[in-house]
């Protein structure tokens, strides 16, 4: 079996049926293998788009996303996508071609050390030099990708290795049962939560990647401890559930009243204000659960750290709970969340021109429907979206949540989300600046019959940065953009395009775009 076929056959054995890629000579043997193994290759227009689409695919399906690029600039163009996935804790496997081993370091075409470039932004990076060892390297990469806190991995595949021939076997990987918390730590956690008057749960990305949706619901319904969700865990407990307060934007009033917080699968980074104000007072006691011990102590040390898989630990906590449910506090917390929700929802009503940004977000929510996958990207546009976009099921709201503050992810995310869930409506709300990064992936969507609706907030500027520039300095510059007719880009590839300049027309226009099926 040729090396390219080995790669494809091994991936097929792990259940992979779609990959994202940008072609080049050094990686072509893998594409041939994908054809033979029945793996769909969704070819993008930029390598960053391929990796980001793979991450979105992972965040919708809960399974690793796979991407391929060629050697040299193929690798360098993919680095930001890797950094986003790794910082976000998303399992993404990028493989690239490489110059044949005999031509390394000769100044030949597209020869660059992909391993050295990608190591700083991945959990693991390496190069395979022997066709017979391809399965071993693939297995190592996969285990590193999904083991502990998930992340991005990279494997470099020299051209002569991919064209080599070997007799190998492939099979699905088997994994050990994930660990739970120690009995002593578990008992302490149950005591702290049971004695608390105003406990809260914050569920982060680790809860999603552990597959803890059922376990989170069971724990919440038994204990009646209110839950807020963030990042990849949005929708893990649906917004609107009796025990779910929703996103952090609506949970703030309850959080600052809490005396004990159970933090599930998230670090104290910017997404939770580093464990300090305005979401935390410093007086609450923290119980932090994470599969990755190095997550403990970042910016704030918890009173109790439980090392274990979130899904397993939640089952342990539910089984061990013997305190009274926190019904009264849950009602109070829920009411505070509803107050915040009403305040944010009030911003979605407006009229006239220019169109208020809240009106755009509100129209997206109403027209997309409860089963849609919503995506936001940009500065100002994303800020409005995170306060108004709901999540009624896991994987239904995607936005960049890495500490890099990366913009330009939206169009590739929409592409990957639609590939992951072809039967669901996908709507992207994006700023005009961010749209420019991935605009040509509209051609990818059209070519692969992956329709989604992109709603562009077009203010002719890098708005968020321009606001800050104007606040700090006496003049603004380098933050202006043309107020382009971006709808014509969609039309150029056979899609539906419409320009809207009045608030009253936003909802109907979004409806027409969705109904067009383009």
Where do the PLM segments sit?
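Phosphate/pyrophosphate-binding active-site segments
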Residues: 132, 168, 191, 283-378, ...
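Glycine-rich, acidic loop regions that bind phosphate or pyrophosphate groups
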Residues: 96-137, 159, 231-335, 510, ...
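Conformationally flexible catalytic loops at phosphate/diphosphate-handling active centers
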Residues: 140, 144-195, 344-345
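Glycine-rich, anion-gripping cofactor-binding loops and their flanking helix/strand elements
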Residues: 59, 205-287, 392-424, 437-440, ...
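Active-site diphosphate/adenylate-binding microenvironment
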Residues: 7, 22-35, 336-423
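Glycine-rich phosphate/diphosphate-binding loops that line cofactor/substrate pockets in enzymes
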Residues: 5-17, 56-62, 86, 144-148, ...
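Thiamine diphosphate
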Residues: 95, 104-105, 109-110, 255-258, ...
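A short, small-residue-rich loop immediately preceding and capping a beta-strand
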Residues: 17-20, 40-42, 60-99, 202-205, ...
């Amino acid at each position: 079996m040729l090396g390219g076929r080995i790669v494809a056959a091994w991936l097929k054995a792990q259940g992979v049926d779609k990959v994202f890629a940008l072609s080049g000579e050094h990686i072509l043997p893998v594409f041939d293998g994908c054809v033979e193994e029945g793996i769909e290759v969704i070819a993008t227009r930029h390598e960053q788009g391929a990796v980001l689409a793979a991450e979105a695919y992972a965040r919708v399906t809960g399974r690793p996303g796979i991407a391929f690029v060629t050697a040299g600039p193929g690798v360098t163009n993919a680095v930001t996508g890797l950094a986003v996935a790794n910082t976000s804790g998303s399992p993404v496997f990028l493989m690239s071609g490489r110059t044949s081993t005999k031509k390394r370091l000769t100044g030949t075409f597209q020869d660059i050390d992909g391993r050295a470039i990608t190591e700083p932004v991945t959990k693991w990076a390496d190069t395979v030099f022997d066709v017979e060892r391809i399965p071993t390297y693939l297995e190592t990469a996969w285990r590193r990708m999904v083991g502990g806190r998930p992340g991005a991995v990279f494997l470099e595949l020299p051209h002569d290795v991919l064209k080599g021939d070997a007799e190998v076997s492939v099979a699905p990987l088997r994994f050990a049962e994930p660990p739970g918390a120690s009995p002593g730590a578990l008992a302490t956690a149950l005591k702290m939560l049971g004695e608390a008057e105003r406990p809260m749960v914050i569920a982060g990305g680790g809860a999603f990647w552990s597959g803890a949706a059922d376990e989170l619901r069971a724990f919440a319904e038994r204990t009646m401890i209110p839950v807020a969700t963030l990042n990849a865990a949005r929708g893990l407990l649906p917004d609107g559930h009796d025990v779910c307060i929703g996103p952090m934007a609506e949970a703030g009033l309850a959080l600052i009243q809490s005396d004990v917080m159970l933090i599930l699968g998230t670090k104290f980074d910017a997404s939770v204000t580093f464990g300090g104000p305005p979401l935390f007072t410093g007086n609450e006691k923290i119980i932090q659960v994470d599969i990755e011990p190095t997550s403990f102590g970042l910016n704030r040390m918890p009173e109790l750290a439980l090392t274990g898989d979130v899904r397993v630990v939640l089952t342990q906590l539910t089984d061990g709970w013997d305190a009274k449910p926190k019904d009264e506090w849950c009602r109070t917390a829920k009411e505070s969340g509803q107050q915040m929700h009403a305040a944010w929802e009030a911003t979605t009503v407006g009229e006239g021109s220019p169109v208020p940004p809240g009106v755009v977000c509100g129209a997206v929510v109403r027209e997309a429907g409860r089963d849609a996958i919503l995506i936001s990207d940009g500065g100002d546009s994303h800020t409005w979206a995170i306060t108004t976009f709901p999540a009624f099921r896991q994987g239904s709201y995607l936005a960049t949540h890495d500490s890099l503050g990366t913009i330009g992810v939206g169009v590739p995310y929409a592409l990957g989300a639609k590939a992951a869930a072809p039967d669901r409506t996908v709507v992207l709300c994006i700023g005009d600046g961010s749209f420019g990064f991935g605009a040509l992936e509209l051609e990818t969507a059209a070519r692969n019959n992956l329709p989604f609706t992109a709603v562009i907030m077009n203010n002719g500027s890098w708005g968020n940065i321009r606001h800050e520039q104007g606040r700090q300095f006496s003049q603004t510059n380098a933050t202006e953009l043309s107020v382009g007719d971006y709808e014509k880009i969609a039309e150029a590839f056979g899609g539906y395009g419409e320009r809207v300049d009045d608030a009253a027309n936003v909802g109907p226009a979004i409806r027409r775009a969705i109904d067009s099926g383009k």
